[in-house]
Amino acid sequence: MIKQPALAQEQYACVYAWLALLFFREVDDEGLIQLQSAEIADWLALLKRQPALAASVALLEQKIAALSLRQDAQLELAADFCGLFLMTDKKSALPYASQYPQQEPGMIKHLLLEAGMEVNDDFKEPADHLAIYLELLSHLHFSLGESFQQRRMNKLRQKTLSSLLEWLPEFTNNCLKHDPYGFYAALSQLLLAIVRFDDGKEDLSIVAAE
């Protein structure tokens, strides 16, 4: 059996940035068109080549295809997003690290400081939002392409992944329980699979995108 090459740093970075956007704000009309585009289909096909990601990608592909069968799909997705990520009742999946007792308080601020980053003043959500973790991982993977920073950035990448994995499984489980149509449940399962896949490469070498 032919072993598929690992994802390139740039590919990880782009996927994390894409997921950060989807978990940060509702999908608008333009975003819905993009979700159903050939470009996204190609990205998912690339991820699907990795056996560890194949099942999660296939599930997300099914949920994206099902959007074409939903009346007012954009409005329905917006309602799903609001119910899952903006409500505070027991049927939500809040995307904040501080909502999960496993996470050390203020960890994301320490990670950002180590990376020389800070949250933009225009960002109106708490700094421990899932999107911030994913943007940080995107930045770190891009930085791994700069050889003089490789060791430091790889160590920080591992710390960020470990911190995220303290609460991401519970977040994903909440999405599974409370997302009736399943798009965000599938998205969270893919995210968890990618983070675990990334975390499994402790001695991450530089892989250039072709």
UniProtKB/Swiss-Prot annotation:
Keywords attached to this entry: Chaperone, Cytoplasm
Stretches of the chain forming a coiled coil according to its record: none
Family annotation (SUPFAM superfamilies): TorD-like
Record-level GO cellular component terms: cytoplasm
Keyword Zinc: no
Predominant localisation class: cytoplasm
PANTHER family named among the record's database cross-references: CHAPERONE PROTEIN TORD, CHAPERONE PROTEIN YCDY
Family of this protein: Belongs to the TorD/DmsD family. TorD subfamily.
Protein name: Chaperone protein TorD
Organism: Salmonella paratyphi C (strain RKS4594)
Gene that this polypeptide is encoded by: torD
